[in-house]
């Protein structure tokens, strides 16, 4: 018997090793632990690491990387960046491993701006610090991976020529925005009119929707550019958002791992993943959510280095004013760091993320805690005695004041179309529902608050059965992908040369990326707990914020494509582990070569998997047997 899915809509720079910490980051961010250091010597923790052998990948403490791995470009080595590996002799810059005033024999050297910056960040503090021969690659690699991702996302973007899955909601809402600035109702045959190229059948009554406006405004942008009467117009923004996300994940991997090779790996893996590809080729909200979340993470990553540069410069200025280094008083709390502009950018991006879907609120909480922990550890490494209390007061409170109000104002601003209208849903609710004691609030604010309360009740009570609903327990293994589209063309239909054919869109993830990424998360957890690498913790924070909250709502109707919000972090986690496999440039040639072969094999398998599943990702017409061959699990049907 032929089995077919039932398409339906839902209701409702030099490389840094993941294995070894950044300069000075011998412990997890905010852990409060530091290496015991002999004056002027290397830390005991680093000597212990050396005795166990070199840590994989191009370590943050060994700032050399080859392109390709195993080769050292001329002039690549940066002075003062060789630390003990396997018992070798180290060259340590002044103050490199001196992590507090009480342990320091030469404070005047340890608290210079150069020594502090190297201890807190490392010599390669931005792409400008890369050797001239490699600066171009810092931008070229993300660009090339984005071009690949763009080709996959924009090619045949207008296929199929129909509203796919929840496009029936969001595309029509977006067209309402283009026409009226708010959601309006549609007649029963609206989908047929859209497909026929006649979207101008809007009704005059408002439509009740339960998601904020940002994603729909972004879809509307594509329709404004290319028209709302064709699939390319209503899918353009989703494809663009997916392409930009590929660029960002590659750039973030370059920044996070300080490795050109791993930047290319991360960009390639996201570019070819089927789950992200499908979400980038259909106008649902989730790909926009993923974009703004990843952009916020990137901004906070930039702020991490910027804050440490400020701390180094201001602490060095205080030290320079005192003979023999900073005074004990200066090291009690450390300096204020002033306005953190990248945190403003992060607040803006998080506001846009929440304005796309409320589930972004969990990322706001996770990222807020993460950035404060980074600052606490920076003060600890710099030698601030009361680093915890000082970090909370001088970094934590400013972070809250900077990020949260900006995100809140941005979120409210996304409702501008609703505010400017007179007929939007619940727009006049406060006028007909006076509230004694609350009349000091503008009616528009009271009406919007009521709208949000009703939407919250809807989400809490969303528990209707759906043939493609899936439990979060199955997401990482792609247990139940959602069928977005399925048709059975007959022989004679263009592309169909057999009796029965299939044309499907199934957002099934690349098995190498998702199954390998799931294993990688377990390894990251051990690496974060055991090696206390802040990068592993940051990646896990992104996955946890997008994944774990769904377990709190076991009765709610959920779908696997919600996972695209944290998929970039899953890719970063897999890239991290591939970096461990690859090894670092100081490893023996045989070790680097074997690691390179394994990583290359993984990438080749990932590319082959995408090529194999590509027809069912993009609605190509294939024979039924070819379609059935790609349904690896019964739950995929």
Where are these regions (language model features)?
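Transmembrane helical bundles and short interhelical boundary loops of multi-pass, membrane-embedded
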Residues: 2-24, 32, 38-51, 55, ...
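Short helix- or helix-capping micro-motifs
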Residues: 149, 266-271, 278, 350, ...
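Membrane-interface transmembrane helices that cradle and orient dolichyl/undecaprenyl
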Residues: 102, 257, 296-342, 372-382
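Transmembrane-helix signature of polytopic, membrane-embedded enzymes
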Residues: 144-145, 232, 249-272, 291, ...
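Start-transfer (signal-anchor) and selected internal transmembrane alpha helices
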Residues: 1-152, 394-407, 595-599, 603
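Aromatic-rich transmembrane-lumenal/periplasmic boundary elements in polytopic membrane proteins
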Residues: 154-195, 398-399, 407-480, 622-631
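Transmembrane-helix motifs of polytopic, lipid-linked glycan transferases
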Residues: 236-257, 295
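Short acidic/glycine- and proline-prone juxtamembrane loop motifs at membrane-interface regions
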Residues: 163-164, 234, 238, 278-288, ...
């Amino acid at each position: 018997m032929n089995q077919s899915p039932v398409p339906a809509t839902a209701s409702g720079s030099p490389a840094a090793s993941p294995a070894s910490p950044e300069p000075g980051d011998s412990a997890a961010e905010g852990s409060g632990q530091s290496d015991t250091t002999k004056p002027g010597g290397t830390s005991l923790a680093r000597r212990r690491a050396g005795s166990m052998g070199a840590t994989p990948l191009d370590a943050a403490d060994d700032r050399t990387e080859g392109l390709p791995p195993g080769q050292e470009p001329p002039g690549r080595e940066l002075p003062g960046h060789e630390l003990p590996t396997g018992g070798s002799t180290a060259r340590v810059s002044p103050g490199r491993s001196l992590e507090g005033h009480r342990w320091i024999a030469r404070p005047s050297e340890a608290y210079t701006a150069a020594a502090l910056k190297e201890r807190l960040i490392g010599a390669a503090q931005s792409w400008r610090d890369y050797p001239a021969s490699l600066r171009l690659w810092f931008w070229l690699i993300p660009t090339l991976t984005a071009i690949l991702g763009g080709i996959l996302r924009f090619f045949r973007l207008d296929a199929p020529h129909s509203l796919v899955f929840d496009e029936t909601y969001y595309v029509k809402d977006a067209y309402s925005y283009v026409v009226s600035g708010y959601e309006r109702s549609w007649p029963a045959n609206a989908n047929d009119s859209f497909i026929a190229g006649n979207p101008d059948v809007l009704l005059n009554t408002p439509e009740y929707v339960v998601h904020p406006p940002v994603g729909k405004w972004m879809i509307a942008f594509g329709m404004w550019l290319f028209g709302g009467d064709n699939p390319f117009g209503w899918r353009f923004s989703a494809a663009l958002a997916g392409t930009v996300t590929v660029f960002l994940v590659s750039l973030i991997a370059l920044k996070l791992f300080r490795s050109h090779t791993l930047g290319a790996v991360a960009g390639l893996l996201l570019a070819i993943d089927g789950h992200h590809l499908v979400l980038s080729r259909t106008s649902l909200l989730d790909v926009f959510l993923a974009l703004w979340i990843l952009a916020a993470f990137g901004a906070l990553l930039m702020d991490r280095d910027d804050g440490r540069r400020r701390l180094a410069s201001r602490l060095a200025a205080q030290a320079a004013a005192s003979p023999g280094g900073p005074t004990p008083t200066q090291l009690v709390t450390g300096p204020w760091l002033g306005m953190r502009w990248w945190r403003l950018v992060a607040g803006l991006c998080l506001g846009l993320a929440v304005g796309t879907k409320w589930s972004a609120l969990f990322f706001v909480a996770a990222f807020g805690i993460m950035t404060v922990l980074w600052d606490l550890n920076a003060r600890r490494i710099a030698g601030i005695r009361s680093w915890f209390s000082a970090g909370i007061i001088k970094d934590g409170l400013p972070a809250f004041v900077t990020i949260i109000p900006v995100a809140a104002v941005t979120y409210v601003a996304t409702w501008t179309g609703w505010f400017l209208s007179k007929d939007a849903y619940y727009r006049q609710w406060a006028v007909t529902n006076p509230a004694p004691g609350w009349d000091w609030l503008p009616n528009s604010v009271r009406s919007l608050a009521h709208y949000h309360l009703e939407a919250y009740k809807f989400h809490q009570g969303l528990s209707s059965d759906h043939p493609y609903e899936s439990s979060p327990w199955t997401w990482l293994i792609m247990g139940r992908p959602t069928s977005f589209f399925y048709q059975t063309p007959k022989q004679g239909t263009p592309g169909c040369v057999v009796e029965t054919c299939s044309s499907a869109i199934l957002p099934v993830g690349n098995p190498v990326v998702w199954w390998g990424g799931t294993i990688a998360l377990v390894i990251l957890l051990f690496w974060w707990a055991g090696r206390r690498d802040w990068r592993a913790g940051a990646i896990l924070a992104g996955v946890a914020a997008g994944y774990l909250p769904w377990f709190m709502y076991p009765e709610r109707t959920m779908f696997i494509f919600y996972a695209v919000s944290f998929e970039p972090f899953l890719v970063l986690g897999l890239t991290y582990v591939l970096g461990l496999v690859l090894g670092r440039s100081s490893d023996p040639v045989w070790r680097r070569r074997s690691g390179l072969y394994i990583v290359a094999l993984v990438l080749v398998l990932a590319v082959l998997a995408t090529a194999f599943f590509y027809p069912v990702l993009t609605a190509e017409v294939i024979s039924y047997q070819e379609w059935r061959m790609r349904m690896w699990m019964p739950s995929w049907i």
